[in-house]
Amino acid sequence: MRKLALVPIQFYRYAISPLMANHCRFFPSCSCYAYEAIENHGIWRGGWLAVRRLGRCHPWNDGGFDPVPPAPSSRTSSIAE
């Protein structure tokens, strides 16, 4: 299911995005961010992170470096210690 959610993002990145000028104010670009967020966090959480990022990508935002937050680590390692 996760791979199916990534197909439209890949299509945009490789078929549509090269035809348009670079408009994203962030690094990584919004499409790269969305792909990485869904890949690392799953469809629901990653999709929510991508929607929030797209909401911040507008002319009144300065942009800059905005990486995908790391996936939460498992709690079992801290419990075992």
UniProtKB/Swiss-Prot annotation:
KW Protein biosynthesis (keyword) present: no
InterPro entries registered for this protein in UniProt: Membr_insert_effic_factor_YidD
Entry keyword set: Cell inner membrane, Cell membrane, Membrane
Location in the cell: Cell inner membrane
Pfam name, any one: YidD
Region annotated Disordered, chain positions: 61-81
SMART domains: Haemolytic
GO cellular component: plasma membrane
Top-rank taxon: Bacteria
Bilayer topology term: Peripheral membrane protein
Entry's family note: Belongs to the UPF0161 family.
HAMAP family in alphabetical order: UPF0161_YidD
PANTHER family in the record: MEMBRANE PROTEIN INSERTION EFFICIENCY FACTOR-RELATED
UniProt function note: Could be involved in insertion of integral membrane proteins into the membrane.
Record-given protein name: Putative membrane protein insertion efficiency factor
